[in-house]
Amino acid sequence: MLVMSISYLHSIQDVSFVYETGDRPVLVLCSDMQQYICKYMRPNSTIAYKLACELIGAQMADAWNLNTPPVAIVNIKPNHWNNSVSHSIGAPAIGFRKMENVLDVASTTYKQVTPNKDTLYQLLKIALFDFWIANEDRTCNNANLLYNVETEQIISIDYGGVLNNVLFDNPLSQLTETDSILCADIFAHICKAVSPKTLFQNVQLLEKDYYKCIGRGKKQKAVLQTMPKEWSLSADKVALKIDELFATQWIEETWQNFVECLMSNSNYGK
């Protein structure tokens, strides 16, 4: 498998919307005629590593064959910025294509997700991915998931909290049980609709797939070559952090942690 192809795009219109969330991402129409939700450099010492996490997370999610929006490096032209948005001039943004015909999975919408063995497998795989990549931003209170009702695809979004929320100066640490989507209502909703046998079979399949995902992920380590130089990242620091994901002990502990969390939140193993 080749390294995920990254598109390099530029804005062709003014920023059309500013999302009033923590990172204040912006929506912009790009040169491929698609709209992208973009996160960008700001006068902040840690934001570059957060952008790196977004890119690493997106590429690893692709290696895992998760449903995730296409990603691009976006040059938002100076005259297209909204004056109310503080940003670093000249530094490219990271953009995720805006998905159409999807709903945001939340406490008021999760029951619209069709509960069956396929959506169960998708959610289990996303949960395992989060354990492996130490994604602290997807929790029972913040799913960071979209859902396409027509195709029954669960779509993973937002990777700024991977690698333990940008703590690049410390070793990776395993997520706690409450950090997992397995503790969320959507998992209980899907899990109670399938048999214990189906759950067991899905976990067996996932364990086999896990090691294949790790193998494909190793080929994505060239992600470093795609990071804009304007982000002024320490390539050595990022490389060491990515290497931690592929340590044998980390891979084994991740699976064990995932299974323990699964047992606490389902009838698996009972």
Say what each PLM segment does.
Residues 95, 100-109, 121-123:
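Ordered, amphipathic secondary-structure segments that act as subunit-interaction surfaces
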Residues 2-102, 132-136:
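Conserved ATP-binding subdomain of kinase catalytic cores across diverse folds
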Residues 154-270:
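C-terminal catalytic region of ATP-dependent kinase domains
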Residues 13, 19-23, 90, 120-136, ...:
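A short, terminal or domain-edge coil/loop segment
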Residues 62-66, 94, 119-123, 170-172, ...:
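Glycine-rich loops and low-complexity Gly/Arg-rich segments
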Residues 72-75, 138-145, 193-194, 202-207:
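A general structural signal for short secondary-structure boundary/capping elements
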Residues 110-168:
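Conserved kinase catalytic-core segment
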